[in-house]
């Protein structure tokens, strides 16, 4: 494949918190088109007026998320003063202790509360006063300007930049931070997002930046992040922040083959499957769910080894034309990161991946400038290959490299890969130029000649895309049975 410098991953993957807040303020602004489908439309062919700004029908009436109006301060200026006066020095001393006394724990408890509860103080996230020079006035209903990212950084520095902190003190402090964070899950949306991002960033060690070794995540934080994912009342912007942490924990903390790790990754995957099976959620959320399922590396329902629930759900997303290109392509990429065995009929899955490429080629020809086509096609390409720009050495819990070329016999996957490779190579060699009629006809002929007669992954599986996937009950962190998620309510 010709060499080319590309940015793997959509803007979503490198999204800022402010963009997540925009999702809270304009929940429908990212819709691919007014009907919510990915089919080519007349406007795709004709182009939108001036090809500038957002297409007609994309901007819709919306209201600011009510979660942005919540004010529930759990800490005061007086509490800050009291901590600095009475507990700051004992807190710093306690972090040096290798055997924590009751007084040490009391000091660390106070320190954890100081660092966590301050996130709820309005002064750290309220709108700044208007500038007098240009008389700028904050836009009514706009999300508050935040300074909470500084609190996140400073809290992490408490353990990362403290050369004298002991392992036992670090673990106890992180445990208390995680525990107290649960008290913020019904606070202002900005507060929730920041505390959830923090949980995914908590470092169990300092890593070795010089050698490219990232700090290990604090794995127990995943239970709080999963609590947000399972809560149907949580805003999707908060859930996306939770997924960011789960991605890091799965990638850096749970990837090694180990029974305990396998159990946690399965618990995470089973919580994500019913969320991805829903169709009424934002495409950005769906994209991140698929990405996290790929990193979790679980194929089967741990309660039923004959049910490849994760693979089935991802394959259904790939085949679903009502979903966004990014979600569908990321689902294909995630499939290449699952452990696959010879009990699975992968023929219909591979067929749907090529069919997705064909769908995109048709839509690309309708309007080559309309979407992030290069990103979509390269994400689809990564279903077969490991990502070089962010080295992927092996799938979670396994030894093989990511990608369907590594997972399946060459005779089963090589021809499929070549079909996708041709589509991607066209964008590399001819950016902005349409596929020729001969190219499209060739893909169409291949699809007609390779249409599978059996569209089931296993004998007991539903046909891909035929009906809703039977999702398992999410497994709670406490191990107790939980009630199944209620039917989703469509956004008004």
PLM regions and their residue ranges:
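N-terminal acidic, proline/glycine-rich, low-complexity intrinsically disordered segments
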Residues: 2-4, 31-35
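Bacterial N-terminal signal peptides
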Residues: 13-28
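N-terminal secretory signal peptides that target proteins for export/translocation
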Residues: 1-12
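Extended repeat-based scaffolds of very large eukaryotic assembly and lipid-transport proteins
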Residues: 34-290, 301-309, 325, 347-354, ...
């Amino acid at each position: 494949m010709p060499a080319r410098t590309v940015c793997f991953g959509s803007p979503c993957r490198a999204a800022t918190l402010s963009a997540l807040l925009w999702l809270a303020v304009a929940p429908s602004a990212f819709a691919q088109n007014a009907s919510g489908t990915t089919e080519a439309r007349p406007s795709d062919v004709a182009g939108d007026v001036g090809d500038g700004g957002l297409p007609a029908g994309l901007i819709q009436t919306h209201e600011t998320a009510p979660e942005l109006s919540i004010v529930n301060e759990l800490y005061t200026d007086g509490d800050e003063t009291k901590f600095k006066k009475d507990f700051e020095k004992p807190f710093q001393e306690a972090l040096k202790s290798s055997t924590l006394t009751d007084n040490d724990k009391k000091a660390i408890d106070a320190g954890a509360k100081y660092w966590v509860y301050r996130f709820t103080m309005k002064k750290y996230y309220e709108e700044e006063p208007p500038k007098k020079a240009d008389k700028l006035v904050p836009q009514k209903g706009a999300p508050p300007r935040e300074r909470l990212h500084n609190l996140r950084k400073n809290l992490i520095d408490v353990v990362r930049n403290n050369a004298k902190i002991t392992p036992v003190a670090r673990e106890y402090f992180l445990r208390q931070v995680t525990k107290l964070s649960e008290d913020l899950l019904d606070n202002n949306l900005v507060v929730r997002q920041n505390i959830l991002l923090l949980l995914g960033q908590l470092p169990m060690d300092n890593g070795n930046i010089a050698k490219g070794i990232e700090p290990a995540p604090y794995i127990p934080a995943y239970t709080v992040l999963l609590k947000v994912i399972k809560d149907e009342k949580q805003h999707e912007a908060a859930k996306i922040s939770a997924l960011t942490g789960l991605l890091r924990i799965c990638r850096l903390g749970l990837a090694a083959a180990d029974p305990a790790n396998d159990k946690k990754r399965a618990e995470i995957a089973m919580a994500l499957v019913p969320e991805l099976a829903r169709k009424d959620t934002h495409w950005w959320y769906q994209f991140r769910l698929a990405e996290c399922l790929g990193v979790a590396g679980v194929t089967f329902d741990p309660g039923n080894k004959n049910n490849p629930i994760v693979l089935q759900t991802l394959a259904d997303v790939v085949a679903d034309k009502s979903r966004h290109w990014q979600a569908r392509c990321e689902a294909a990429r995630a499939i290449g990161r699952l452990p696959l065995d010879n009990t699975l009929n992968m023929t219909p899955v591979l067929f749907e991946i090529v069919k997705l490429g064909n769908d995109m080629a048709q839509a690309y020809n309708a309007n080559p400038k309309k979407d992030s086509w290069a990103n979509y096609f390269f994400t689809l390409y990564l279903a077969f290959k490991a990502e070089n720009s962010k080295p992927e050495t092996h799938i979670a819990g396994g030894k093989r490299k990511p990608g369907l070329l590594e997972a399946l016999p060459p005779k089963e996957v090589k021809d499929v890969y070549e079909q996708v490779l041709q589509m991607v190579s066209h964008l590399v060699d001819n950016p902005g130029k349409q596929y020729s009629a001969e190219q499209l006809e060739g893909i169409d002929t291949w699809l007609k000649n390779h249409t599978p007669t059996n569209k089931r992954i296993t004998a007991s599986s539903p046909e891909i895309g035929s009906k809703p996937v039977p999702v398992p009950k999410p497994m709670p962190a406490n191990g107790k049975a939980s009630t199944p998620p209620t039917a989703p309510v469509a956004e008004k």
